[in-house]
């Protein structure tokens, strides 16, 4: 048998000589591959252990153990590399130190952990929009001497800025901090040169401490040490004194904000050297003097807001050199003169507000044709004269316009219909004519939501249905005010078509007739003022079916858009500064004082649970004060004075805990004045003219006046008294019956016992 046969007999197959080296090579390569895999695995473990610096890791774990969040807790897993934890960034060094912590909007609360100070390589720390509290620790920058960005805004930090004493390593090199944002906290005290972030900082580019309670003078020394500063924000604090000279050293400054403080004096001249300035925000202070002509040097200025100060003088004639201006707000000052013609060169203006100054001139002569981007125009409360400025129709982007409280004459131009985006129009307190023509034109403004035209059209007749033929006019009107004009006629029925109406003011006119019940059908109406008219008849029950006043849910369904201009619903409110920037800020109320209404107050009034104000004074209302008024749990003001109301003041009104004003002067009320709750705070004068009232805050005792004829008491109170009498009699009768039964049973058994 051959060798090949022997191999086959044993079950083997002979391989060729060429296959044996290949198999050996394959086994060798597999071995090498396994060694590589093992090496990579060991290397990855070693690298993994080396990625996270152990000291930094312990500091972070200490950090997470000292802050909490019920909304978004820190789920840092101690078993994995800390460089992979959420919000953590490490450098590429062999030790892999922590260089950044970014955990905004996590609802973290607790003290700012001191363990952060051990992260000596930290360059960025962002813990903004949380609930951290406590003081900033002393030595903050000395420990974190690599920190470049610090954002602790929107927290609850308090106390003063600590004084920085020494550097961590004893060297004299400066801190590299570049961005500091401590806004929206509760920090206080003065910002001194030795304060943290001030001593040894030479690279600051942004410093924001707005919305705190800092006091003293606005610091300017950082402009000397950090000339690269581009943003300074000191607004919404309690800084006092003058704006210091020295801010002009910040030649790179693009944003300077110090509004809403108590600073005074003039704007320093070196401010006008800031050629890079884009925003100058100094409103709501006590600044005086005039706006210097040198302000035209700030050619990069986009926003100039100096409103609510005591500035005088005229607007610089060359204001048009500020061609990049987008917002010019100089309202509520004492600025005089005319609007410079060069203002037309500010073609990028989006918002122009010069309200409440002493400006004059003819508005119709102003060139509005170049303001193609203008969205908000407010020239109210000045002394502008002439016809309605028809050229304003060139401002195609205009959405809000106010010329109220000026001396405008003539009629509203049909060109206003070209302002397709117009949503707010305030023309109150002028000398405009032809209300029928005005409303006929304005009903075509499809986007108009607020129309204030009161104190115009004196002694004209309110247009009737036949005068306004459009069936779909004012489709989006929410606020309509035409009070103070002495308008004649009746409340027009065409108003019922305004289904979006939420606020209506027809006060201070000469309207006659009755109050239509359909006023109660508006789904969103929550504010009605019909005061000081000649309206007669009774209060319609349907008026108290207003859905928006019957439930909080329906009231909340009313659109709550932010108004682009503050609204003075009644033109008389301008002097008392009762302005509203949001529709729902108006107190839900019904004002019908000083009319000729008679009859009783409908009990349906108790359905208006959202009502805050009810004024029915100076009418001829009679009957009782309905106890259903106690269901108005949101009521703050109730004025029923100067009517013919009788009976008692319902004791149930003491449950109205929000009621801060109550007046029933000059009625025919009797009985005791309720005590307790808010009734202990109302002055005695609010009850005068009711000789039969007693008790409470009055000196008159109720001993001689508690027994009053039933006709002078409230029906509800009488029913309560009758019910009490019935219960008393029933109780006495029951007692006699039980006693008799007991007596009979006892003596019956006694007789039986004796007989035995």
Curated annotation (Swiss-Prot):
Domain of life the protein comes from: Eukaryota
Region (C-cap/acidic domain): 699-725
Keyword terms: Cell membrane, Glycoprotein, Leucine-rich repeat, Membrane, Plant defense, Receptor, Repeat, Signal, Transmembrane, Transmembrane helix
Observed effect of gene inactivation: Normal resistance to F.oxysporum (f.) matthioli in cv. Columbia. The double mutant rfo1 rfo2 is strongly susceptible to F.oxysporum.
Subcellular compartments: Cell membrane
GO biological process annotation, one example: innate immune response
Transmembrane region(s): 726-746
Positions in the Cytoplasmic compartment: 747-756
Segment forming the signal sequence: 1-50
Stated role: Involved in the perception of CLV3 and CLV3-like peptides, that act as extracellular signals regulating meristems maintenance. Contributes, with WAKL22/RFO1, to resistance to F.oxysporum (f.) matthioli in cv. Columbia relative to cv. Ty-0.
Protein name: Receptor-like protein 3
Organism of provenance: Arabidopsis thaliana
